[in-house]
């Protein structure tokens, strides 16, 4: 199945949606990375706190995606897939940006263009400042 270049409303096409981790989902055969955020890794966690946060982020993303109508929005001029072959896209539930919700909730942080260390910054006080606002730009 070839995905729409701009918006896919999952209810309209009957696509199955699987949450891989806190920033990656799969819709049918397409792997999608939530653009603009980074969530802790489940399989490659470097400490127990990162692994726990990764599991919480995955569960929160599952809750969000199950709570309403899901739209996957790709750029009109799509970026190439990331180095893992994932499509970069915004994901909205009932019109709300899932990436912003995850950032504000402390489940993810802004993507800076490179993987940041989670274990040293998992003190909630360190994350609190970063989660006060969501200015994910697309």
Predicted regions and their residues:
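Small beta-barrel nucleic-acid-binding modules, primarily SNase/OB-fold domains
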Residues: 2-138
């Amino acid at each position: 199945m070839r995905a729409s270049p701009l918006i896919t409303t999952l209810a309209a096409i009957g696509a199955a949606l699987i949450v891989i981790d806190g920033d990656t989902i799969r819709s049918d055969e397409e792997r999608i990375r939530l653009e603009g955020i980074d969530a802790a890794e489940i399989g490659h966690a470097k400490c127990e706190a990162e692994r726990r946060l990764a599991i919480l982020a995955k569960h929160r993303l599952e809750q969000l995606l199950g709570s309403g109508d899901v739209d996957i929005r790709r750029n009109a001029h799509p970026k190439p897939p990331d180095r893992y072959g994932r499509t970069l896209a915004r994901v909205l539930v009932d019109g709300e940006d899932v990436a912003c919700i995850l950032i504000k909730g402390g489940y993810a942080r802004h993507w800076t263009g490179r993987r940041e260390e989670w274990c040293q910054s998992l003190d909630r006080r360190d994350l609190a400042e970063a989660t006060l606002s969501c200015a994910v730009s697309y």
